[in-house]
Amino acid sequence: MTKPIEFYFDFASPYSYLAHKQIRRIEEKENIKINYKPIFLGGLHKLIGITAAAFINSKAKFMIRDCKMVSKKLNIKFKFNPLFPINSLNLMRGLLSINSNIKDSYIDFFFNAYWQDGLNLNDEKVIFDILKQCKVKKNDFLKKIKDQKIKDKLKKLT
């Protein structure tokens, strides 16, 4: 029996986005399913006591150049978001709180909004518009992201 492949990711990470696009291609081509596991990258950085590359000028410049190069090589539509980095905590919690039948569209919509369309995912109105496209009720989302079980689950995954 084959073990499932798990992909740990955060919407705030450009490398997660690029990997996500490749994963979708592989899933389609090979007819397999990858299990997406949300983490909170900001919390992980804090936990291990490192400063994210986004906050170190030389590393940030390299990351931007690297992501553009990789996206071009792999023919992935990509725009480095000038609002990088975002606080993705509520988006990651939200993924853990929605029905499994809409998780794929939720993931695709939020990744594309941030890394293709350059939208501001720190803006609640933008988030609510995307939730509507995903058929997630705003009030349910707002309630569930505050649920301690959801918070604990994300901490555990991180």
Spans of features found by a protein language model:
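Structural alpha/beta surface segment adjacent to cysteine/selenocysteine redox centers
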Residues: 17-117
